[in-house]
């Protein structure tokens, strides 16, 4: 008697076929973000009467890309501040220092994010020793 390895059934064709393991749509698309949950949100949100099969996959991919981009920049900001944990301040610095993300999230307030450090040029002390340095360097040429 055959073991049924090729036919997908048990006991030589008798009995119930073995159930195949279900594969999520996220893993089929190679994503970490939940495609099924986003599909459920799209259907429940009444954005349209019907939702295509590819729409939640595409939206999941876009959201995953944006999250990865923000997390990479925030991780760099945390490393620059010699920290190992990303806090809202690092996310704020990452978003506001990136031109495209700042434009995308321009009207968004990040809680506990603080503000960007910025001192106006007129408030900074002026360089007085600039002219003396030029004279000194000219005298050194002789």
Swiss-Prot record:
> Where, subcellularly, is it found?
Nucleus; Chromosome
Keyword annotations for this protein, in alphabetical order, are:
Chromosome, DNA-binding, Nucleosome core, Nucleus, Phosphoprotein
At the top level, the lineage of the source is: Eukaryota
- From the Swiss-Prot or TrEMBL record, what is one GO molecular function term? protein heterodimerization activity
Q: Which SUPFAM superfamilies match?
A: Histone-fold
Please note every region of biased composition (Gly residues).
Answer: 1-12
- Which PROSITE patterns does the protein's record reference? HISTONE_H2A
**What ranges does the record give for the region Disordered, renumbered to this chain?**
1-28
Name of this protein:
Probable histone H2AXb
Function per UniProt: Variant histone H2A which replaces conventional H2A in a subset of nucleosomes. Nucleosomes wrap and compact DNA into chromatin, limiting DNA accessibility to the cellular machineries which require DNA as a template. Histones thereby play a central role in transcription regulation, DNA repair, DNA replication and chromosomal stability. DNA accessibility is regulated via a complex set of post-translational modifications of histones, also called histone code, and nucleosome remodeling.
Tell me the tissue specificity: Expressed in meristems and dividing cells.
Modification after translation (UniProt) = Phosphorylated to form H2AXS139ph (gamma-H2AX) in response to DNA double strand breaks (DSBs) generated by exogenous genotoxic agents and by stalled replication forks, and may also occur during meiotic recombination events. Phosphorylation can extend up to several thousand nucleosomes from the actual site of the DSB and may mark the surrounding chromatin for recruitment of proteins required for DNA damage signaling and repair. Widespread phosphorylation may also serve to amplify the damage signal or aid repair of persistent lesions.
- Kindly state the positions of the motif [ST]-Q motif in this protein: 139-140
Q: Which residues carry this modification: Phosphoserine?
A: 139
The Swiss-Prot or TrEMBL record describes its family as follows: Belongs to the histone H2A family.
Q: Give the source species.
A: Arabidopsis thaliana (Mouse-ear cress)
Show the domain comment. The [ST]-Q motif constitutes a recognition sequence for kinases from the PI3/PI4-kinase family.
Q: How does it assemble?
A: The nucleosome is a histone octamer containing two molecules each of H2A, H2B, H3 and H4 assembled in one H3-H4 heterotetramer and two H2A-H2B heterodimers. The octamer wraps approximately 147 bp of DNA. Interacts with numerous proteins required for DNA damage signaling and repair when phosphorylated on Ser-139.
């Amino acid at each position: 008697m055959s073991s049924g390895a090729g036919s997908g059934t048990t006991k030589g064709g008798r009995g119930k076929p073995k159930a195949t393991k279900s594969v999520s749509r996220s893993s089929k698309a190679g994503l970490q973000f939940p495609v099924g949950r986003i599909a459920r949100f799209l259907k429940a949100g009444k954005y349209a009467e019907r939702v295509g099969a590819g729409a939640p996959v595409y939206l999941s991919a876009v959201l995953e890309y944006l999250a990865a981009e923000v997390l990479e920049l925030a991780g760099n900001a945390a490393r620059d501040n010699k920290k190992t944990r990303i806090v809202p301040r690092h996310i704020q610095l990452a978003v506001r220092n990136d031109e495209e993300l700042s434009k995308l999230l321009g009207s968004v307030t990040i809680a506990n994010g603080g503000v960007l450090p910025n001192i106006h040029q007129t408030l900074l002390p002026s360089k007085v020793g600039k002219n003396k340095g030029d004279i000194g360097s000219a005298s050194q040429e002789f």
